[in-house]
Regions:
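C-terminal, non-catalytic "cap/extension" segments appended to globular domains
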Residues: 21-30, 57, 62, 107, ...
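Catalytic Zn2+-binding segment of zinc metalloproteases
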Residues: 350-364
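Short alpha-helical catalytic segment bearing the HExxH-like zincin motif
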Residues: 338-349
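Post-HExxH zinc-binding segment in Zn-dependent metallohydrolases
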Residues: 222-232, 359, 370-404, 495
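C-terminal motif of bacterial Sec signal peptides marking the signal peptidase cleavage site
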Residues: 16-19
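Active-site-proximal, well-structured secondary-structure segments within enzyme catalytic domains
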Residues: 145-151, 159, 185-333, 403-412, ...
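Positively charged n-region of N-terminal signal peptides that target proteins for export
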Residues: 1-4
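N-terminal helix-rich structural modules
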Residues: 23-185, 480, 554
Length: 557
């Protein structure tokens, strides 16, 4: 009798499991059909929006910005569909076993969550952001009545010893701010309104959470970054200030923002007798980059054939990379001049491009993206630094051994300073945006300069009360994005360590970069090809053997 009861129980359990598996299979079939229907709608809209943005930034024409706004709104309206969001919520809580299916649902859930607001508010946000961005991109500051480009301003700040001209150039870089401040602030309020309607404290918190980042963890990382870099930066900035004050024949305490090499002090000022521009000025930096990437098995010729490489009136004055269709149409928008900065920028943007181009196209559409925004920034930064790598420069620029030796010490110093300077600048941006969305009614002009003085240790200009914060395009066009650049720096350092181990060398400086297809293969296999198949944190462990850490960034300073 006991055996009979036991057999009945086992039969019951088997039937239950079969029924459960059948239900899961039915749910998975329903989920796949739902995702297929979303793909059919979202895929062409994404492509249309990307193409419109490309044409807008290439030409500066209002008609393309309007087309971009329309396509973006149409796309946002799809994500705002409440019935579809409810389906995603149900599917997310179901026990789907297929990992690719479950991952797509997770990604779509957060994408829809961020848009669950009424269409009127959605329309306001989309149209205002596009209008402000168009104004920003077409604006050119003036020096003594003459319109100047961003490149013109940078050249003055890098090379001129005329203090009056330097100040005028710096002020020209800020002239866009009053033209966009009012609408940018209105945009902040609209973004916060949307976030609060969804149950978040503010837009910054919502942006992190819906992008699979923990606000508490991000805050912890940036506090640690501040503590780890504060004294090294203070020491090195005193050295830089001593050199700059002698160059300009003023006291160190008289240095102001226009005495540095970039309008925001993002870049290393000219504190070395070595000027790397001399090695690039008679070269073609685009061809150098093309040759380099081909040598590591990550060809970029198709990317460059579709790209927009040189500056002209009305064109977007900065740089970006875009994946138009997730099917191979990847492009970069740059404004190249043959100098070290643009060598770095072209390497950076093509770093994004080789990532996007080498994602496995057999993956479902919604997984054909980078694992995270900061993982593609990490790759871009990993390659960007090669413009200051003496071994790489010798190979790519045909320098002789003596020339390589001449720049080795200077480039090592530049790379250290670059890391420190950017870390402190990223602290300004992270803390400004965090505070901006927490309290947009505060005195933002004062907040901006308080943070610049605290983290970058630059004195604010006397008697200046201008919305200088609004001259940074990221606040409008790429909100709550800047922290990803610094997280990318941390991952780039961790990746350098992992690749050194992979190549069997004990120092990242000994990594073989040039004509090494094995390097490209490592990146394709471990990072690029998997796309967004895994969450960013799982991908990093798989690729490097450990969780994201600031350890290697600090060690490599």
């Amino acid at each position: 009798m006991k055996k009979f009861i036991l057999m009945l129980f086992m039969l019951f359990m088997v039937l239950m499991m079969m029924n459960c598996d059948s239900k899961i299979k039915q749910t998975e079939q329903m989920a796949q059909a739902f995702i297929d229907s979303l793909t059919n709608v979202i895929k062409p809209l994404n492509k249309a929006a990307n193409l419109a943005y490309w044409e807008a930034t290439a030409s500066g024409k209002d008609e393309y910005y309007e087309r971009y706004a329309g396509a973006s709104l149409e796309l946002a309206t799809v994500y705002a569909n409440s019935a579809d969001f409810e389906k995603l919520k149900t599917l997310k809580s179901s026990k789907i076993k297929d990992p690719l299916l479950a991952r797509q649902i997770e990604i779509l859930y957060y994408r829809f969550l961020a848009k669950q607001i009424d269409t009127t508010l959605l329309k306001q946000i989309t149209e205002m952001q596009t209008a402000v961005e168009a104004r920003f991109n077409k604006f050119r500051g003036k020096i003594d009545g003459r319109a100047v480009t961003g490149n013109d301003i940078k050249e003055i700040l890098v090379s001129s010893n005329d203090l009056t001209l330097r100040k005028k150039a710096w002020e020209a870089s800020k002239q866009v701010a009053p033209a966009v401040e009012k609408d940018m602030l209105a945009l902040v309020h609209l973004r916060n309104e949307a976030a609060r309607k969804l149950g978040f404290n503010n837009f910054q918190q919502m942006s992190l959470i819906t992008d699979e980042q923990d606000p508490t963890e991000v805050e912890r990382i940036f506090q640690e970054l501040d503590a780890a870099t504060r004294e090294p930066f203070r020491h090195d900035k005193a050295m830089m200030d001593s050199i700059l004050s002698k160059r300009f024949n003023i006291k160190p305490e008289e240095l102001r923002p226009w005495h540095y090499a970039d309008p925001f002090f993002q870049d290393v000022p000219a504190v070395s007798a070595v000027n790397l521009d001399q090695y690039y000025q008679n070269q073609n930096v685009v061809k150098i980059a093309e040759s380099f990437y081909a040598g590591i098995g990550l060809g970029v010729s198709p990317v460059l054939a579709n790209s927009d490489l040189y500056e002209r009136p009305g064109k977007y004055p900065h740089a970006y990379c875009t994946d138009i269709d997730r099917e191979g149409d990847v492009r970069i928008m740059v404004n190249v001049r043959n100098n070290e900065e643009w060598m770095a920028t072209v390497l950076h943007e093509l770093g994004h491009a080789v990532y996007s181009s080498n994602i496995d196209r057999q993956l479902p559409y919604f997984l054909r993206e980078e694992a995270h925004l900061f993982t593609t920034e990490a790759i871009a930064m990993f390659f960007e630094k090669l413009s200051k790598n003496p071994t790489w420069m010798r190979a790519m620029l045909n320098l002789d051994a003596e020339e390589e030796a001449d720049i080795r010490e200077a480039t090592a110093q530049m790379l250290r300073l670059q890391k420190l300077i950017f870390a402190r600048w990223s602290l300004v941006m992270y803390n400004f945006e965090k505070s901006l969305y927490e309290n947009p009614e505060q005195d933002l002009n004062k907040l901006w300069w308080d943070l610049v003085e605290q983290y970058q240790m630059i004195k604010r200009p006397e008697n200046r009360n201008q919305p200088d914060w609004a001259s940074k395009i990221h606040v409008c066009s790429y909100p709550v994005y800047y922290h990803n650049y610094q997280l990318g720096e941390l991952l780039a350092a961790q990746l350098t360590e992992a690749i050194a181990r992979y190549q069997g060398v004990n120092d990242g400086a000994k990594i073989k970069y040039v004509n090494n297809p094995d390097l490209g293969n490592y990146l394709k296999t471990n990072i690029f090809s998997v796309g967004r198949k895994y969450r960013w944190d799982e991908m990093i462990v798989r690729a490097t053997g450990e969780k994201l850490t600031a350890k290697y960034f600090v060690e490599q300073l």
